[in-house]
Amino acid sequence: MTAFKRIFSPALLVLALYGGAAHAALVPPQGYYEGIEKIKTSDGNFRCESAPKPFTGALQFRSKYEGSDKARATLNRDSEQAFRDSTKDITTLERGVAKMVNQYMRDGRPAQLDCTLTWLGTWARADALMSTNYNHTGKSMRKWALGSMSGSWLRLKFSNSQPLAAHQAEAELIEKWFARLAEQTVRDWSNLPLEKINNHSYWAAWSVMATAVATDRRDLFDWAVKEYKVGANQIDDQGFLPNEIKRKQRALAYHNYALPPLAMIASFAKANGVDLRSENNFALQRLGEGVLYGARDPRHFAERAGEKQDMKDLKVDGKYAWLEPWCALYQCVGDTLERKHRMQPFDSFRLGGNLTRVYDPSAQSKK
């Protein structure tokens, strides 16, 4: 051995060790490792419905705010119905997968898992939702659906019960489809001007983050973190998002809607050694506190947005599902913790199902 090798081999060994750590497999937060709650031996009258028809057409959908002014805050009932009709198969898939994964993680019935895999496998084989002929509403549906599916999938993939161990070929097929959808989502939502980056971009980043962990793709993870930082740095000193304030009477509702994807991204990043909590002087914490205060007294939002706030969505407990990852990040206490416990359990199909089971299982068991 030469002197050069004798001197530098230990250093190279250390570099190799640390280099491996730097590229460790991506993981979800701890709660995703939970096993099946209690395996049931009966069939529970579970019936696997036929999978919704894979959507392979152009992602051209009417917006429910069609005809609204630039605030995009006035609902158009006719176009909303047209939107729901044309996207029915997609939302049926999203809701159905989240529901079946919830059921399987609770009961462990093989039929529940088989049905989930059949639905996802059917859409994966059709390469559904991959059209590059889309409008804004269409690309929005793509990323919402991806976040729903990947978010649910994570509970199967990382569960200590290892439900996918006997289904590796099908799992690989589905995950490759998720990865293709994520790559297209990155193309859909990259390089937007700052004035166009709003809650849609945050939801796109959440879908890519969930898929990054499901498929162990560091490039997708890095993109989601980058998009998170853009969002966090849009939050001003008072906890407002300027591009959501533009929504006038729905400004507070859209601030609340921006929180779930941001909180989930920060939670997943932290699980992988990237601590985003303090980004832009703890902007995510500031945003959450502002929304919680605004839900009780919306005057500050009304003053900033210039209109009285529509509080309909703020009265729905399920709209606060972001409290689960957010409280895990910032250690909620006192009144905020009480509000969270009062509203639990949180079940959001767009975030992959039952978040209380993932983030606060002791509370889930009391329900």
UniProtKB/Swiss-Prot annotation:
Signal peptide coordinates: 1-24
Domain of life per record: Bacteria
GO biological process: alginic acid catabolic process
A GO-annotated cellular component: periplasmic space
Keyword annotations: Lyase, Periplasm, Signal
Places the protein is found: Periplasm
Uppermost EC category: lyase
Molecular function (Gene Ontology), one example: poly(beta-D-mannuronate) lyase activity
E.C. no: 4.2.2.3
Residues binding substrate, per UniProt: 63-64, 136-137, 254
Catalytic reactions of this protein: Eliminative cleavage of alginate to give oligosaccharides with 4-deoxy-alpha-L-erythro-hex-4-enuronosyl groups at their non-reducing ends and beta-D-mannuronate at their reducing end
Main location: periplasm
Family designation: Belongs to the polysaccharide lyase 5 family.
HAMAP family, A to Z: Alginate_lyase
Described purpose of this protein according to its UniProt entry: Catalyzes the depolymerization of alginate by cleaving the beta-1,4 glycosidic bond between two adjacent sugar residues via a beta-elimination mechanism. May serve to degrade mislocalized alginate that is trapped in the periplasmic space.
UniProt name for this protein: Alginate lyase
Provenance organism: Pseudomonas putida (strain W619)
